């Protein structure tokens, strides 16, 4: 393990309660961790001037220099709020979206503490996807470059043996997806986190949405209770509240309000509030309403994207899928057919929301709401481009109320509900039900061709190996 250069002036360690005789409670327990009263960070009477430098936040010179070398000119809002509190030794709940600078908000305090008391397996960051895990690890290594910090990434899809060798080198920071971390805790000889000092759960709402809850419970049970914990999430759902109660001690909450996103005046936006079980039914109704127009249907997962493509084809719609698990040639083929209008419906994950050369379309349907407001804006930005008009309709079910309110908050306005005719919708029920059954068979055939990896999609569940795949 490389030597960490200790800081010249040691900061006095904060007083902490002794919890060494008890394990962390399960996040499934509603009455877990009784001493977890959440404290809101109260705004001051007069507005404070935003810190202009990282030094003003209490960071040492080496880390300030690292921020400068990384191109961080001034602290973002979440960094300005979270870093001083973290340096005081408090557990934190950070409500902030992707792109807010939250990675540095938790990485910098951990690195500063690491310089005081260098040790292996000092910090653990849990992330929902492989791509995010690598991004976080790169941030730690970049910010810790002047103090020789080493991190390792544990994610699915990679060789367990090479990861075990990396763990044997005793890195300071581990960035992992929950499934693969638990695999190593259970199977890698000599690997333990009993001396862990810092735990971060990044994008906690997505961790729970992706069914990592039971795995998180198992991980929390083997971590030392005497640690600092940071939980970052875009939303504060009931599941996240439960996870907070199980894992944090007297946390402070810091929230950064989203800026109001602007949309063009030629875009007609609305939402449709329906029971989750009727999503397919209302999708067919809307496609009939906009027949002949080009449409992108956005889904949250690869499985749902592929299933909807089969389902719509069975009903006679010219639908084609686009997602990250297609080969490059298949993705280019799908885009080519959509551009040429030989297929007028593109069913896609968020790979189609940004970065791809997709022409403007007539209609965007958010079949699944995205995890953050910025992605929502990118999605609906696929229509009403270059002065043209466009329509964007978002599906909201009983499970999406908080997410939808957050999106409306980011937009800065309430959107109208789309006036669906329920009687006309229900007329389609028999045909839709038949197509759903046939689509299940189509998915089974598709999975058999894909092999054992695909069979996991057929059941709608993923093993630990696949749970952390980027949804796009």
Swiss-Prot record:
EC number(s) from the headed UniProt entry: 3.6.4.13
Biased composition (Basic residues): 452-462
Transmembrane segments: none
Listed name of the protein: ATP-dependent rRNA helicase rrp3
This protein's UniProt keywords: ATP-binding, Helicase, Hydrolase, Nucleotide-binding, Nucleus, Ribosome biogenesis, RNA-binding, rRNA processing
Predominant localisation class: nucleus
Ranges where the record places region Disordered: 1-52, 443-472
Record gene name: rrp3
